[in-house]
């Protein structure tokens, strides 16, 4: 059975630990901080088998070098570090190009891992699907999506459309606890969305108890995430009103997404 555990890092990052019982070897996703990972490994008597990276940003990769040295010192083995080939990340020794290779089989994880090409937040951003779990870094957040630092709106919309087509029961393990702030924006865009209203209440209660709102699910995101709903008339009308656009012609999805992202950037 695959167990997935969150290690909290910095202000709002989640580093995900993947363990297939009964193995004591684990993988971690996007370890921006080595110290919290090492503390977790030691306290749970686990060995680090590998690292999965989604993109190059420091809060996702900053701990890789120290973790690699830790494994070399404690086991005399070379740590396997998987990451996007396009981003030339330090310490990655298994570069992945999902346009050429879309599946992985990792030691100690009894499951095929699907590698997805999801540019937008960064130029080479990738995501991993393991059983019913999606590890999407900073591409898809609960009720939101990542900023466009390197990619285009067209790329990000394509990436989000790809993720939205995953099975509804897919659990969404993004890398940040941004849910409440994203929900505030989503309700500004779509105030009459009953699913949004209900989830805002639930998420607020969860955070008040210091509980994580992650994982989300693809089904939930289809219902509440404005960036997955840019074809909905309620979203289109809200964008037109916000940007003072009286044109009766229906906006296409790319234009809606572009304007929605611009709106969120200054929200």
From Swiss-Prot:
Binding residues for Zn(2+) 2, per the UniProt record? 59-60, 138, 176
The record's Pfam families line, in alphabetical order, gives: HAGH_C, Lactamase_B
UniProt GO molecular function:
hydroxyacylglutathione hydrolase activity; metal ion binding
Per UniProt, the enzyme's principal EC class comes to hydrolase
Q: Which residues bind Zn(2+) 1?
A: 55, 57, 121, 138
For whether the record's keyword set contains Metal-binding, the answer is yes
**CDD domains the record matches:** hydroxyacylglutathione_hydrolase_MBL-fold (cd07723)
Q: What is its EC number?
A: 3.1.2.6
Pathway where it operates: Secondary metabolite metabolism; methylglyoxal degradation; (R)-lactate from methylglyoxal: step 2/2
Keywords for this protein: Hydrolase, Metal-binding, Zinc
Which GO terms fall under biological process for this protein? methylglyoxal catabolic process to D-lactate via S-lactoyl-glutathione
UniProt remark on cofactor binding? Binds 2 Zn(2+) ions per subunit.
Cofactors named for this entry:
Zn(2+)
SMART domains, A to Z = Lactamase_B
User: Would the keyword Hydrolase be found if you checked this record's keyword annotation?
Assistant: yes
Q: Which InterPro entries match?
A: Clx_II_MBL, Glyoxalase_II_hydrolase, HAGH_C, Hydroxyacylglutathione_Hdrlase, Metallo-B-lactamas, RibonucZ/Hydroxyglut_hydro
Provide the reaction this enzyme catalyses. an S-(2-hydroxyacyl)glutathione + H2O = a 2-hydroxy carboxylate + glutathione + H(+)
HAMAP family given for it? Answer: Glyoxalase_2
Q: What does this protein do?
A: Thiolesterase that catalyzes the hydrolysis of S-D-lactoyl-glutathione to form glutathione and D-lactic acid.
Subunit structure, briefly? Answer: Monomer.
Q: Which family does it belong to?
A: Belongs to the metallo-beta-lactamase superfamily. Glyoxalase II family.
UniProt-recorded name of the protein = Hydroxyacylglutathione hydrolase
Organism expressing this protein natively: Shewanella sp. (strain W3-18-1)
Q: Provide the gene name from the record.
A: gloB
